[in-house]
A protein has these predicted regions:
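Short beta-strand to alpha-helix junction loop
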Residues: 91-100, 127-137, 182-205, 218, ...
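Glycine-rich FAD pyrophosphate-binding loop
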Residues: 48-72
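Dinucleotide-binding Rossmann-like beta1-alpha1 core, especially the glycine-rich loop
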Residues: 76-165, 323-325, 329-335
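N-terminal Rossmann-like FAD-binding beta1-loop-alpha1 element of flavoenzymes
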Residues: 29-57
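C-terminal lid/capping helical subdomain adjacent to the catalytic/cofactor pocket in oxidative enzymes
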Residues: 25, 389-481
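Flavin (FAD/FMN) cofactor-binding and adjacent substrate-gating region
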Residues: 120, 130-218, 225-229, 338-356
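Active-site substrate-recognition segment that forms the wall
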Residues: 45, 61, 79, 112-121, ...
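Core beta-strand elements of the Rossmann-like FAD/NAD(P) dinucleotide-binding domain
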Residues: 27-29, 237-247
Length: 481
């Protein structure tokens, strides 16, 4: 008799209407992906197009794909490359650029009309204000230009030619501060990750029936229980029945950690959810303008971006507010947060080290104030004026219904806050992806890594020449590794 490890995996309060004996899909699947955001759908696309695995499925608890963290309202819509993100070292930028170029090459394979509906081409820059920041950019430029060939170092007059509102204090007067920028000419910079997710699903669905493949797409399907029958068989129970699989990949953002810990994996981690809010202004920028990140803070500095959803508006943000929720504006996820919080002395040691620094403490307190109506605009205006000095409070409006949650992991053993995407791989036929920023940008790179692991453990085959031709060659060739 098989020893069964049963795990209750609720990540939304909802009535269950299906008996545990009803089968959602017949037979044993090669891989089931749990979570239909951009990470999960990218993996489904890769497995369906580039492997010989025959039976694949994706389970998404909501009525459509990418309605949470991957929705365009819940992230900055940026394809992060490491060129204008000053918290990235050269090696980290090289790593991120590779993943960004995989994504951009995928987009370039789409018909022009579809690509333009998903993404947009704009210029971008990181702005330095004052002597210290300008010197920083001047030192950074010769190093990063080796990786980003089109990059240019701009002074005040050059910036004025591409982003006049950045340089003007008012209609007729230039701002007094010294200005410099690392400027990147127009390229694919912006992506609606919800539309991208649906594109991945369409591509995967088109493989249904090709070479006897079966691709099962399941919306409104919430996982309620996972049974680990043995190292190569999992029984996933949902509100619509159960499905069996040889391999499972959980791509449910912060809920991935909750599911993992219910299965006694990743117990060394806690979660620090960081919520981000945004503000709208009129159309004041021609492209993305980032500012230099404070090295003492693990959060992105405020930036301005032409919005891909609200055409004709510029979105400023994000703020960074620690919040005890795994999903913004979903109080049901408070209980879920408490499950992955796991407070102990090690965790409080991490908190103490984070907040004993006055810079961090002031930053967090200030971000709490950014959520207070009326007061928030006056406080946030100071940050925004670093980019557009002529803006007033009348020009800003709080983006109601915008802003997501980034589940930052804390390793309680090493007592460190982990920045960037996380993965829990216990070495069995199950993987858990926890993907805060820049997880959307890295969806195909992360998916390629998972695809290779899956095929290695299932004795499957990856068509590597096809992967290289499709993702590594094209308008954004990955020839710098």
């Amino acid at each position: 008799m098989l020893r069964v490890k049963s795990v209750f995996c609720r990540y939304r309060r909802q009535a269950r209407h299906v008996s545990s004996g009803e089968e959602l899909a017949a037979g044993v699947y090669d891989t089931v992906v749990i979570g239909g955001g951009v990470t999960g759908t990218a993996l489904l696309f890769l497995l369906s197009k580039f492997t010989n695995l025959k039976k694949l499925a994706i389970l998404e608890r909501r009525s459509d794909f990418a309605l949470v963290a991957s929705h365009g309202k819940n992230n900055s819509q940026t394809i992060h490359c490491g060129d204008i993100e000053t918290n990235y070292s050269f090696e980290k930028a090289k790593f991120i650029k590779r993943y960004a170029d995989l994504l951009r090459n995928y987009l370039c394979h789409l018909p022009a009309e579809k690509r333009e509906g998903i993404s947009s081409v704009t210029q971008k820059m990181v702005l330095g204000v004052g002597e210290k920041e300008c010197s920083f950019l001047e030192e950074r430029y010769p190093v990063f230009r080796k990786l980003f060939k089109p990059m240019k170092l701009y002074g005040k007059s050059d910036i004025h030619s591409v982003e006049p509102r950045v340089v003007l204090k008012n209609e007729n007067t230039l701002r007094e501060e010294t200005l410099a920028a690392l400027y990147m000419p127009p390229e694919l910079t912006t992506c609606d990750y919800q539309k991208l997710s649906n594109s991945f699903v369409e591509c995967a669905r088109s493989m249904n029936g090709v070479d006897s493949k079966k691709i099962s797409i399941n919306l409104n399907t919430e996982v309620t229980n996972i049974e680990e029958a043995n190292e190569s068989l999992y029984i996933i129970h949902t509100n619509r029945g159960f499905i069996k699989s040889r391999f499972v990949v959980v791509c449910a953002c912060g809920h991935s950690l909750m599911i993992a810990q219910k299965m006694n994996y990743g117990l060394e981690y806690s979660c620090l959810p960081v919520a981000g809010s945004f503000y709208f202004s009129g159309n004041v920028l021609n492209g993305k303008v980032y500012t230099i990140q404070n090295p003492a803070l693990p959060f992105a500095a405020v930036h301005g971006d032409p919005d891909i959803i609200e055409k004709g508006k510029t979105r400023f943000g994000p703020t960074a507010l620690p919040l005890p929720l795994l999903e913004r504006d979903n109080m049901n996820t408070l209980v879920d947060f408490l499950k992955v919080w796991n407070p102990d002395l090690s965790l409080f040691h991490v908190y103490f080290n984070l907040f004993k620094d006055m810079t961090m403490l002031k930053y967090v307190c200030r971000n709490f104030l950014f959520e207070i109506p009326i007061l928030n605009k006056y406080l946030f205006l100071k940050d925004v004026r670093k980019i557009i000095p002529s803006l007033t409070t009348r020009d800003l409006s709080y983006c109601v219904g915008y802003g997501g949650v980034r589940p930052q992991l804390i390793n309680k053993v090493s007592k460190k806050l982990i920045l960037g995407e996380g993965k829990i791989d216990p070495g069995k036929n199950i993987i858990f992806n926890i993907t805060p920023s820049p997880g959307a940008t890295t969806c195909l790179g992360n998916g390629e890594s998972d695809m290779n692991i899956i095929c290695e453990r299932l004795n499957g085959t990856v068509d590597r020449p096809a992967v290289r031709k499709f993702l590594y060659q094209g308008d954004y060739p990955v020839d710098y590794l």
